[in-house]
C-alpha cells in the first residue's frame, strides 16, 4: 500500500462535505418536546454506488425531554444517543441543551436487497424491492440484539412467517433461567401489554425457526444487547416495517463493527463497539482495525491520519469521520504539455517535473 502519514486532518462528515478540525458537523437545530413515536427515514440512493445516507443534526431540549424519548423520536437506540452526548444526564438533561443526533450511516457491505442487520451497530436496514427502472431505496431502524448465551446467529436466512398479536411460548431454557432468578414464567404469555414480543413478529428460518424480528413491551432497551437471541424493535418501527415485508424476504445478519467508504476522495470511517459471539461489546482490536483500513485503501495513494483514526475507533460512537484523503501520486504520468507562451523556454515533454517534497512526518 502506497500511503503517506501527514499532519492533522481530523474531520467529521457532513452529507458529502467535510470540515477539517470540526468536532462534528450538524445540519439544522430542532427544538422538540413530547417525543413519543419513532420516525424512520426512507433514503433514495441517487446512484447504485452510493454508500452514505442521512445527515447528522442537532436538537435543543426542553424540560420534559429525556434522551430515551428523543432516541425513540429520532429512530435511534438509547445507547446510541447517550454515547454521542457524554456528560448529559439521560433522564434529566434539562432545558436548552443542544444534543448531537447522529443520523448519517455508511451502508453495510453486500447486496442492497432485503433486510440487513449489523449486530455491532444495533441497526436494521431494509431495501424495498425497486420498481423496474426505479432507484434503490433503504429504510433504517435501531434494534436490540441477543446477549450472553442467547446468541443471534450470523449469516443469510429469510422470513418464513408473520404474525400479528403473537402469543409468546418461552423456550424451556428461558423459563429455567427466569425460575433460577426468582421470576418464573408461564408456559405461554398471551398478546397484550405484558408480552415481550409486542404486537408484531416476523419469524426467521435461522435456528429452526426459533428467531424472530419483533416489537417489545420495553422500548427503553432498544439499541442494547438484551434479548434472548431475537431482534427487537420499537413498537412504532415494527408496526411500519411489518406490512412491507413479504414472506421469503432475505435477511442477512452481519458482524461489521467497522465500516469504511470512499466519498469524493475522502476515506470515511464509522466505528461501533465490537461484539463477541454472545452479542456483548468488548474493546476494539487496533491491529485488526489497521488491517481493515489498509484493505480499504488498497493501492490508492492516500494520506492517513493514523492517530485520529485510532481515536475514532476507540471512541466507537458511530459518527462518521474522515480519516484519510486521496493524495496525488508522484509517479503518475504527466498531463499533456500546454502550448508554449511567447518567451517560454522550450521544454521536453518527456522530462518529468521535480517530485514534490514529502510532508512533515512522511513515511512514519
Predicted features and spans:
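N-terminal secretory signal peptides that target proteins for export/translocation
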Residues: 1-17
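Bacterial N-terminal signal peptides
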Residues: 21-33
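Primarily a LysM-type cell-wall glycan-binding module
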Residues: 42-75
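Intrinsically disordered, low-complexity Ser/Thr-rich linker and spacer segments
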Residues: 45-49, 102-119, 262-263
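LysM (lysin motif) carbohydrate-binding repeats in extracellular/periplasmic proteins that recognize
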Residues: 62-92, 134-137
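Loop/turn positions that initiate beta-strands
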Residues: 64, 94-99, 248-251
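Gly/Pro-biased beta-strand-loop elements
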Residues: 108-219, 240-243, 271-353
